């Protein structure tokens, strides 16, 4: 399975949401 890394990105000091990035090893 591919590990999923969750990045919490903040834009303008506000939470823009959670981005799910799938890294293919």
Curated annotation (Swiss-Prot):
SBTX is known to be glycosylated but it is not known which one of its two subunits is modified; contains 5% carbohydrates. GO terms for biological process: defense response to fungus; killing of cells of another organism. Expressed in seeds, leaves, roots and stem (at protein level). Signal peptide: none annotated. Disulfide bonds: none annotated. The keyword Disulfide bond applies. Induction: In seeds, induced by jasmonate. GO terms for molecular function: toxin activity. Activity decreases below pH 5.5 and above pH 8.0. Keywords: Antimicrobial, Disulfide bond, Fungicide, Plant defense, Toxin. Involved in plant defense. Inhibits spore germination in C.sojina, A.niger (at concentrations >50 ug/ml) and P.herguei but not in F.oxysporum and F.solani. Does not inhibit vegetative mycelial growth. Inhibits growth of C.albicans and K.marxiannus but not P.membranifaciens or C.parapsilosis. Probably acts by affecting the cell membrane. Does not have urease, chitinase, beta-1,3-glucanase or hemagglutination activities. Does not inhibit trypsin. Injection into mice produces toxic effects such as dyspnea, tonic-clonic convulsion and death. Heterodimer of a 27 kDa subunit and a 17 kDa subunit; disulfide-linked. On the 2D-gel the determined pI of SBTX is: 8.2, its MW is: 44 kDa. This is Soybean toxin 17 kDa chain. It comes from Glycine max (Soybean).
